[in-house]
Amino acid sequence: NMAVSDINALRSDPQLTVDAVQRGTMYYVAMSMKEAHFANPKVREAVRYLIDYQGINKALMPGYGVLHQRPIKAGMPSTLPDPGYRLDVARAKKLLAEAGYPNGFDTTLRVLSDQPFLNIAIAVQSTLMQAGINAKIINGTGNQIYGAMRERKFDLLVGRGGSGMEPHPHSSLRALVYNPDNSDKARLTNFQGWRTGFYDPQLNTMIDQALLERDPQKQVADYQAIQTRYDQLVPALIPLSQMVDSVVVRNEVREYQPHPSATTFLRDVYKVREGEKG
């Protein structure tokens, strides 16, 4: 939870090394489709164009994340190029008017009190307001914020999630998109898709089938088709940045290898005294 200025200051210390480790976890803006406004795909699409992705990543995310707008982590063979969404207030206003909200509406935006979450929420609040969506920020602890999401009792939320122990498209899709049972009684709280009320049986089937596909080229094509359909459905969860872990290591530490799934083994790590060669 260090500030960007703190990370940059540590980079200038000759006794330290700062490693940037790209994770598969996504920072996102989530909407609850249990809430009437966001059940409307035109409203969700309006929100898509009321996020300053480029500005947020340039100003707020150095040391925390890099611009990424797909549910599958960057750099994998199956990952499609970013769709290139940008802040477009005029387009968002038109969509809101078509949805029946020409003057916008009031809502709430939940967010952790930690950085960079809070600064992201403030930035999103500002651009939502330009189209008449007045989002009151509710900040708190993980239990308060993600707890409300697990209970499906929220409007908008800035959060982070996805990926898994292994770098595979299914890990990301299972965490962020998959929702096999959208009923309240299912209580599938591990699935962000269930938390947001986003449900598409065809997409679920595509995800199941892609995992079992044995031909590597066909599997890549399957995962790309999933991303295309997900985008076309105007989902309730909008990825905006892929997480970067900034790991600070003193120069006397040897054999420390940061891991993208936070599973670094410490058994081979050791420290040398000043003047010794390691």
Where are these regions (language model features)?
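Short beta-strand-to-loop elements that line the ligand-binding cleft
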Residues: 1, 20, 109-111, 134-141
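Ligand-site clamp/hinge motif
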Residues: 1-10, 125-126, 134-136
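A ligand-binding cleft/hinge motif common to bilobed small-molecule-binding domains
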Residues: 3-13, 163-169
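Short, solvent-exposed loop/beta-turn-alpha elements that line the ligand-binding surface or hinge
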Residues: 9-21, 30-40, 74-91, 101, ...
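Extracytoplasmic
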Residues: 13, 24-26, 104, 235
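Append "and occasionally in soluble cytosolic enzymes with long acidic Gly/Pro-rich linkers
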Residues: 39-126, 130-131, 197-206, 214-216, ...
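Bilobed periplasmic-binding protein-like "clamshell/Venus-flytrap" ligand-binding domains
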Residues: 58, 98-116, 156-166, 211-251
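Periplasmic binding protein-like
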Residues: 127-185, 230, 236
